[in-house]
Amino acid sequence: MAKGFRLIDMGKNMSKPKLKIKNLYKIFGPKGETFIESVKNGISKQELLDNHGHVLGLNDINLDIPEQRIQVIMGLSGSGKSTLIRHINRLIEPSAGEITVDDEDVLSMSQLQLREFRRKKTSMVFQKFALLPHKTVAQNVAYGLTIQGEQEGVAKEKSHKWIDSVGLSGFEERYPSQLSGGMQQRVGLARALATDAPILLMDEAFSALDPLIRTDMQNILLDLQKDLHKTIVFITHDLDEALRIGDNIAILRDGKIIQKGNPQEIIMKPADDYISDFIKDINRGKVIEVKSVMQKGTSKGAPLDSSCSLEDALKILNNEKNNECSVIDDKGKKIGKVTLDAAISALFREKSLKKSEKYK
């Protein structure tokens, strides 16, 4: 597979849900709850704003987020991404719906229970770093631990492990103003990890960084995830970033999920023209994997790993007799075959799909 994109094991999507969101609505305004039925009956976001002065933030969100996986939520500006992630720890209260974590109802929690939930079950990384300017790197990273009740000295000592994990060893006594933007975001990530919360919420965490630094932060996150196995909800507007780090992706538009699935499903089976337009500029040869275009049966051709990119597979298929290869899993077992024609066909998008409202 081409360097830079993550190998997605289809089996990962079978993990039990850590977090469940059901029939979630958010309407901003003094009487938001009174317009739920109107939204269910089809009133548009623009009509709700023009005629009633209320803003539709989320529209019937249903999403199961698997344990220990990275769930990407993406969409254009104003699609509801940040609104959705802030419902998980109730920084925003919903107008209607259900949110459960480990089958515990988040919306029924008392203020005391919610405070404990935020301290111990979730941690958050923001786009704007949100570091305390008067505290050192070590003190910033230790901050969440002190909130949990750790003595400051003990918390600071524990912080060194996480500072080292994000590559900032030696910068413990520096202040945020003495760090670059990328280094500051590493501190933010270390602070979130230090609390050992099982759920990590990342709201456009890398969006403000330069491309090279952004890629570096993605690498750090993926390397840490191999060991930590967090349940991560990752917000982005960047498709390349979503494809690179996500086990699953949900794409929002006007507060509604238009499509959800693993990266291969999103690319190979876009739900409508809106999604098709969203993915039109990706390099399909680098992103689509052989397993997405393989067929039943066997072949005497050279074996190709199921996660091999089409770009790499085409070079081999073109030189094989009958232009076909066998496909093997990560244990070397044959699981199907792939042909040159199938690989070439997958490089081209379908020209006409189900029309979204934007294209009607």
Regions found by a protein language model. Give the residues of each.
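ABC ATPase "signature
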Residues: 260-261, 269, 337
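A short, proline-enriched helix->beta-strand linker immediately N-terminal to the Walker B motif
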Residues: 194-198
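Short coil-to-helix segment of the ABC ATPase nucleotide-binding domain corresponding to the Q-loop/switch region
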Residues: 135-142
